């Protein structure tokens, strides 16, 4: 099966056919760096990171850009409230974002353009829009004339009245039409600004992505992706700007949108006070469990985020890593199974891929439990093959990329491990001396410290209990 993706523009699943099969292009909208990102903001990077890896396997190369918005009124407000320079806000939260994504197993994009480094390209694109009569200057602002673009609304499929009702549209006296949006606005001396033909100012949010995408990926790109909340007005405006500036019929050939996260059944929002940041979550839970949870529902569907979901993800990973630990005697290199690739080819069906991963682990456990009825060479071949597929399935999803020992000892340090091993040895000595009361007391002590013991034919194993 070839890769098929749901294209929001056409409202259907379509075969993916890149403009250049030697190197597809993909642009994903990144964060505005004024605070730590919440867990909903991580869904796109995780899911589209899986897609990026799939595209590299399929085509051998990929040009993947994910931007950083480092000029925005939210950033200005945060700096003012905290009494620090704007650069202190952007540098701090840009670094935090990269670190949080790394912990979630998100590979960095090939290109991570920052808006402030692309002012010449942004200004040049605005000049093109004015020259082509798709934009106008009014009271030191430059605005895009929505009525000049006949296809406006093709992505969100809204009429003008719906657009005005569904977005925070500023009704300003300098607008020719209420639906027109800002490309450039004036800056006071206290705000960041750049010299331009229209005076000192700064760009609107939408033009930044259009200019950066064109600068790094060209006037027409294969895939543009982001959260469903960006479909309108951000992505709709990107299409209008880009097509009008370049005089082209297509900006992005495939538009992909991931669904939003709900928290304990309610929409995640600052007003409800139920936002959970990635920064907080990776400090409390194994980051790989958060990644697993983000992949557990199809990317286009809403995902109900909860402590129960995280706990279930931890338990599942305990089983998967436990299987790999039991397969330690069988060296193997990762081989991505065909049914995993088929699941991902089906519009990134990660729930199906995770189900296939679980099936592989179950098959391995059955084989491990039934080694006496088969020749040793046959058992070795079968278990080595299953381990290779298990590792490969994990690789395709960005899971199982640490050793079982590292997974089970998360949250402990070398001193903790020495202490734990000493107690395990003491428990072993107590059992050998048939002092079972002492042995049980040691197990209880370790349990109170969050350490779970497992007695196996290979010896005592332990794991740090995670929530």
From Swiss-Prot:
Record keywords, A-Z: Aminoacyl-tRNA synthetase, ATP-binding, Cytoplasm, Ligase, Metal-binding, Nucleotide-binding, Protein biosynthesis, Zinc
A Gene Ontology annotation in the biological process aspect, one of them, is: cysteinyl-tRNA aminoacylation
SMART domains the record matches: DALR_2
**What is a single cellular component term in the Gene Ontology annotation?**
cytosol
- Motif ('HIGH' region) on chain: 31-41
What InterPro entries does the annotation carry? Cys-tRNA-ligase, Cys-tRNA-synt_Ia_DALR, Cys-tRNA/MSH_ligase, Rossmann-like_a/b/a_fold, tRNA-synt_1_cat_dom, tRNAsynth_Ia_anticodon-bd
Cross-referenced CDD domains: CysRS_core
Per the record, what are the reactions this protein catalyses?
Answer: tRNA(Cys) + L-cysteine + ATP = L-cysteinyl-tRNA(Cys) + AMP + diphosphate
Q: What is its EC number?
A: 6.1.1.16
Which residues does the annotation say bind ATP?
270
A GO MF annotation of the entry reads:
ATP binding
Sequence motif 'KMSKS' region, residues: 267-271
Residues that, per the record, bind Zn(2+) = 29, 209, 234, 238
Could you tell me what the cofactor note in this record states?
Answer: Binds 1 zinc ion per subunit.
Q: Which domain of life is it from?
A: Bacteria
Signal peptide positions (record): none
- Cellular location(s): Cytoplasm
Q: Give the cofactors, semicolon-separated.
A: Zn(2+)
Query: Belongs to which family?
Result: Belongs to the class-I aminoacyl-tRNA synthetase family.
| Subunit annotation | Monomer.
Under what name is this protein listed?
A: Cysteine--tRNA ligase
Q: Which organism is it from?
A: Xylella fastidiosa (strain Temecula1 / ATCC 700964)
> What's the name of its gene?
cysS
């Amino acid at each position: 099966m070839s890769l098929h993706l749901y294209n929001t523009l056409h409202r259907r699943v379509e075969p993916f056919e890149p403009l250049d099969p030697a190197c597809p292009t993909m642009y994903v909208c990144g964060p505005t760096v004024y605070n730590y990102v919440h867990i909903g903001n991580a869904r796109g990077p995780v899911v589209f990171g899986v897609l990026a890896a799939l595209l590299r396997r399929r085509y051998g190369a990929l040009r993947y850009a994910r931007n950083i918005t480092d000029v925005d009124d939210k950033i200005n407000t945060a700096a003012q409230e905290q009494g620090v320079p704007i650069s202190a806000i952007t540098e701090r939260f840009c670094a935090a974002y990269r670190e949080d994504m790394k912990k979630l197993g998100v590979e960095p994009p090939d290109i991570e353009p920052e808006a402030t480094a692309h002012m010449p390209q942004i200004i040049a694109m605005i000049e093109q829009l004015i020259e082509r009569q798709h934009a106008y200057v009014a009271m030191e602002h430059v605005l895009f004339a929505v009525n000049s673009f006949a296809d406006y609304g093709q992505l969100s499929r809204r009429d003008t009245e719906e657009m005005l009702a569904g977005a925070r549209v500023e009704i300003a006296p300098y607008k020719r039409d209420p639906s027109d949006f800002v490309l450039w606005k004036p800056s006071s001396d206290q705000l960041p600004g750049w010299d331009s033909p229209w005076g000192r100012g700064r760009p609107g949010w939408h033009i930044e992505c259009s200019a950066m995408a064109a600068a790094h990926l060209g006037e027409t790109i294969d895939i543009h992706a982001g959260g469903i909340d960006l479909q309108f007005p951000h992505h709709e405006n990107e299409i209008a700007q880009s097509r009008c500036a370049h005089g082209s019929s297509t900006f992005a050939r495939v538009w992909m949108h991931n669904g939003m996260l709900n928290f304990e059944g309610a929409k995640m929002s600052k007003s409800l006070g139920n936002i959970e940041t990635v920064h907080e979550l990776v400090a409390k839970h194994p980051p790989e469990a958060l990644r697993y949870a983000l992949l557990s529902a199809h990317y286009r569907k809403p995902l109900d985020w909860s402590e129960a979901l995280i706990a279930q993800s931890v338990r599942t990973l305990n089983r998967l890593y436990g299987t790999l630990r039991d397969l330690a005697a069988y060296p193997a290199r990762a081989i991505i199974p065909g049914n995993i690739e088929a699941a991902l080819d089906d519009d990134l069906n990660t729930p199906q891929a995770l189900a296939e991963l679980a099936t592989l682990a179950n098959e391995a456990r059955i084989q491990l439990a039934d080694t006496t009825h088969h020749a040793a060479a046959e058992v070795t071949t079968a278990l080595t093959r299953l381990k290779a597929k298990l590792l490969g399935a994990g690789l395709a999803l960005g899971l199982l990329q640490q050793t079982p020992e590292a997974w089970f000892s998360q949250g402990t340090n070398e001193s903790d491990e020495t202490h734990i091993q000493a107690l395990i040895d003491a428990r072993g000595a107590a059992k050998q001396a048939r002092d079972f009361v002492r042995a049980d007391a040691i197990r209880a002590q370790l349990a109170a410290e969050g350490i779970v013991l497992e007695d196996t034919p290979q010896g005592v194993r332990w794991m740090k209990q995670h929530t």
